[in-house]
A protein has these predicted regions:
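Extended beta-strand-rich architecture
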Residues: 1-208
Length: 208
């Protein structure tokens, strides 16, 4: 025999921010990207590879872990992009084509010793290798470039239905001058993308 529960079920409260993040993941996977989840732990030296050596480095202090397993896991990351580049570097040893993304937090310490740290969620995408994988049909062997990434981002922004989206020339120390663009929606910058700076590319052991 079955007996119905007499009490009403509790009201289920939604999480709009989590719903948006899941929607973002679905759209990115639908464009053919693979999601990764990397460690939040790193070192300042490893993270700084995403910037040219002669450019200004992070001006905010890294958050140091009190009792890390090892020095390599002794700090909380400043950049999701640095984590995805590290993962791509390892995977490039066994795969010719990479199309990766990660959505996750990056952490910044406060200059005030009594201040609370800051946690920001960011999206990073890395493309490398041929546009298509070899198969029984002829494939496009040309390398993915700036415009492949722009196409993915255009599809993403269309799916999110953001208003007044624009792509304009931009600048970022990680990216090649003249091959970098910023994205704005409603006059507010929402992202930046481009081809990796040659000086950054030289610090990674893979054909970025």
């Amino acid at each position: 025999p079955e007996t119905r529960i007499s009490d009403k079920l509790p009201l289920q409260l939604g999480n709009p921010e989590l719903d948006k993040e899941e929607r973002l993941r679905d759209l990115l996977v639908n464009t053919g990207l693979t999601e990764i989840v990397s460690y939040r732990w790193t070192t300042p030296e490893r993270e700084n590879r995403r910037l040219p050596k002669d450019s200004p480095q992070d001006d905010k202090p890294h958050l140091r872990i009190a009792n890390p397993l090892a020095y390599e896991k002794g700090f909380l990351r400043h950049s999701v992009l640095a984590s995805v580049l590290d993962t791509a570097e390892r995977n490039a040893r066994v795969r010719d084509r990479l199309a990766l993304f990660e959505i996750g937090p990056q952490f910044f310490g406060s200059e005030n010793p009594d201040g609370l740290p800051e946690e920001l969620h960011r999206l990073a995408i890395v493309l490398s290798g041929p546009r298509s994988l070899p198969g029984w049909q002829p494939a496009d062997a040309a390398a993915m470039d700036f415009f492949d990434l722009k196409g993915i981002l255009t599809t993403l922004l269309d799916g999110l239905r953001l208003p007044e989206v624009r792509f304009d020339p931009g600048e970022h120390p990680s990216f090649h001058p003249g091959k970098c663009a910023k994205m704005t929606s409603g006059g507010k910058q929402i992202g930046v993308f481009g081809e990796l700076h040659p000086l950054v590319r030289g610090q990674y052991d893979w054909p970025v």
